[in-house]
């Protein structure tokens, strides 16, 4: 802090109300005696900007307001920092989950296990906490029992400490006079609970609404997205990611000008419309070692930031009849509102199909992996299970993720994920497989009793060879089975009676399935 001259020290130590002066940059004058303790505290408060950053503000003597008046010019380029306490996150629980069937036959999409011990809902939830956002709404609809249970155990029942934050689960419900109670789209899901959000706003200083999806894998500081939203004074900001030719038509694609303003939005274009959305991405700083030419499109991630009042106006008045953000509201809103793009160049994967789910899990086993759950600064949270370490006896393990609480006995595991708490017996070979694990332990005595009764214990049995498979929770199989003998074969018939389905060349063993001895697929 600098002073232009020595100030006279007269009068009692006191502070008078702030009044405007005639200095440049909209300066403010604060009348204060320079020898007081209050002066030191007041000047320190005024000369330090948000988040503890030291300001370049100067206190100078003016000639038109008396000898004891200090002028504090506001810095013309001072940044208006976004406050996480002014942000509320809304996580969409997804629809019927047909693309991820049969994994969603008994659970909602965000409740699908990933990475050995996590659920998909843990991704946006953890990103929120790591970003300092702790006011979260989760909107659920289909098969929500396991999702509600996981949220309660992890985030409400003694798992994560939120301090002054909150997590609220909002289940789809019918209101009086409504014929269709289910959500008709992403925007309709938020609209159905506008009354909850409005009531929340009456008591909380929420200025921005962050809309998130519950079926993606990525690590993001959401406050960087919100900060750009604030810096651009945007009404809506879309988080976007570069994508390649093969998957571009699966997403909503955007074009934006040099200022970052979105000028064109096309939802899942095909043919000539797809070619029209191609852009030059050479200006982007890719976090992964990729060439810009491999990613000539910019896709919307389904992550949006809205000004609170803008969102309420769009859903209640302006577009009250429209149901989806991506295909309906955003293409219209960009002509009437300041819609900005935030380009995210780190790892991002949309878990929308069985193939993308399988590939995303297998990518975690690569060396080096494209995505890491392991980061002490931004960890991912999940339900605390209090399991012991994995026990491994004479096993061969290569490029694999083994979760806690597993029993591995004389088996071989390569490029696979083994979930909690799994059991693999002697002679078992696991390759290119996602094994989700089990809900409970079976002791050695319980296993012996089940075998004596002719029943099948939970786990993978002796001399079983499994490759290119997804094995759901609590699967029971014991001796000499071979799954997916011909890797990549996609025309094999489903076996619903045996609770085995094939999707995109991947064998999916359904939850709680029992596989008979000698089964070959």
From Swiss-Prot:
Enzyme class name: transferase
Gene Ontology biological-process annotations: glycogen biosynthetic process; starch biosynthetic process
One Pfam family from the record: NTP_transferase
Keyword Zinc tagged: no
GO CC term (a single one): amyloplast
Protein name in UniProt: Glucose-1-phosphate adenylyltransferase large subunit 2, chloroplastic/amyloplastic
The gene coding this protein: AGP2
The EC number(s) this enzyme carries: 2.7.7.27
NCBIfam families in the cross-refs: glgC, PRK02862.1
Tissue: Abundant in the embryo and is also present in the endosperm.
Reactions listed under catalytic activity: alpha-D-glucose 1-phosphate + ATP + H(+) = ADP-alpha-D-glucose + diphosphate
């Amino acid at each position: 802090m600098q002073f232009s001259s020595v100030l006279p020290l007269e009068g009692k130590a006191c502070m008078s109300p702030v009044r405007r002066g005639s200095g440049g940059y909209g300066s403010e004058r604060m009348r204060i005696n320079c020898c007081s303790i209050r002066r030191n505290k007041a000047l320190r408060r005024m000369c330090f900007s948000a988040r503890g950053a030291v300001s370049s503000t100067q206190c100078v003597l003016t000639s038109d307001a008396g000898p004891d008046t200090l002028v504090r010019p506001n810095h013309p380029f001072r940044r208006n920092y976004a406050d996480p306490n002014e942000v509320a996150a809304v996580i969409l629980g997804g629809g019927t989950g047909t693309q991820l069937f049969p994994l969603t036959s008994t659970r909602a999409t965000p409740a699908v296990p990933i990475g050995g011990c996590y659920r998909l809902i843990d991704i946006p939830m953890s990103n929120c906490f790591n970003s300092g956002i702790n006011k979260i709404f989760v909107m659920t609809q289909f098969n929500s029992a396991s999702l509600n249970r996981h949220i309660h155990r992890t985030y409400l029942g003694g798992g994560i400490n939120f301090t002054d934050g909150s997590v609220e689960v909002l289940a789809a419900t019918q209101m009086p006079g409504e014929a269709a109670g289910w959500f008709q789209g992403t925007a309709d899901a938020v609209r159905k609970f506008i009354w909850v959000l409005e009531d929340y706003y009456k008591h909380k200083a929420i200025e921005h609404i962050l809309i998130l999806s519950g079926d993606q894998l990525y690590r993001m500081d959401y406050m960087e997205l919100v900060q750009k939203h604030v810096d651009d004074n945007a009404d809506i900001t879309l988080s976007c990611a570069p994508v390649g030719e093969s998957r571009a038509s699966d997403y909503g694609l955007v074009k934006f000008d040099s200022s970052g303003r979105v000028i064109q939005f096309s939802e899942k274009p095909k043919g000539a419309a797809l070619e029209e959305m191609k852009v030059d991405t050479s200006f982007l700083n890719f976090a992964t070692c990729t060439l810009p030419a491999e990613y000539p499109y910019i896709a919307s991630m389904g992550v949006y930031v809205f000004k609170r009042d803008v969102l309420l106006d769009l859903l209640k008045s302006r577009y009250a009849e429209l149901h989806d953000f991506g295909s309906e509201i955003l293409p219209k809103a960009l002509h009437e509102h300041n819609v900005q793009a935030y380009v995210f160049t780190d790892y991002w994967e949309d878990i929308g199909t069985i193939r993308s789910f399988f590939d995303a899990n297998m990518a975690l086993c690569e060396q080096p992996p494209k995505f890491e759950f392991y980061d002490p600064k931004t960890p991912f949270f999940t339900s605390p299970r209090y399991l012991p370490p994995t026990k491994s006896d004479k096993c061969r393990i290569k490029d694999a993720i083994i979760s806690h609480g597993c029993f591995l006995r004389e088996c071989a595991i390569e490029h696979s994920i083994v979930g909690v708490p799994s059991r693999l017996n002697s002679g078992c070979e696991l390759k290119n497989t996602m094994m989700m694990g089990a809900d409970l332990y079976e002791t050695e005595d319980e296993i012996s009793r089940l075998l004596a009764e002719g029943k099948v214990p939970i786990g993978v049995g002796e001399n079983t060879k499994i490759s290119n498979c997804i094995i759901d929770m609590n699967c029971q199989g014991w001796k000499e089975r071979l799954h997916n003998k011909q890797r990549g074969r996609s025309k094999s018939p489903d076996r619903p009676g045996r609770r085995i389905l094939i999707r995109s060349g991947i064998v999916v063993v359904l939850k709680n399935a029992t596989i008979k001895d000698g089964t070959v697929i």
